[in-house]
Regions:
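Short acidic/polar alpha-helix capping motifs at helix-coil junctions
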Residues: 1-4, 36-38, 51, 92
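N-terminal helix-turn-helix DNA-binding core of bacterial DNA-binding proteins
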Residues: 9-49, 73-82
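Amphipathic alpha-helical dimerization/coiled-coil segments
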Residues: 2-5, 10, 80-115
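Alpha-helical residues within the helix-turn-helix
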Residues: 41-42, 53, 59-60
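Beta-hairpin "wing" of winged helix-turn-helix
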Residues: 59-69, 76-77
């Protein structure tokens, strides 16, 4: 796999964003599956606006993309980002989030949001 050289400012912004445990966990979850905000609420002890703010910051840097389906928005990692290869390298050293994903799937947030 060919390594991409990324502008130092963008690398600094990426590392700063991933320095927050919630954002790092969100990105790690999104590596394994797409999610809507209400699904992410199942694994974080925080408010919906807080999760949305974290996702906005990740989206602003181009790490996360969104797809609207009806009134719901699903988030996933942006594999076409110039930071994606670096992000993958970082996430290779982060524990996978299988337990949190099981928690999401077990909780059935569709009863709450309809997504």
């Amino acid at each position: 796999m060919e390594k991409t050289v990324v502008e130092l400012t963008k690398v600094s912004q990426l590392l700063k964003l991933l320095g927050d445990k919630t954002r790092l966990t969100i990105v790690s979850i999104l590596k394994q599956r797409e999610c809507c905000v209400c699904e992410l609420l199942e694994v974080f002890d925080t408010s919906q606006p807080s999760i949305s703010q974290h996702l906005r910051k990740l989206k602003d840097l181009g790490l996360v993309q969104e797809e609207r389906r009806g009134q719901w928005i699903y988030y996933s990692l942006n594999q076409s980002s110039d930071l994606y290869t670096l992000l993958e390298d970082i996430l290779a050293h982060v524990p996978d989030q299988t337990e949190k994903i099981k928690q999401i799937e077990k909780s059935n947030p569709t009863l709450r949001c309809g997504c």
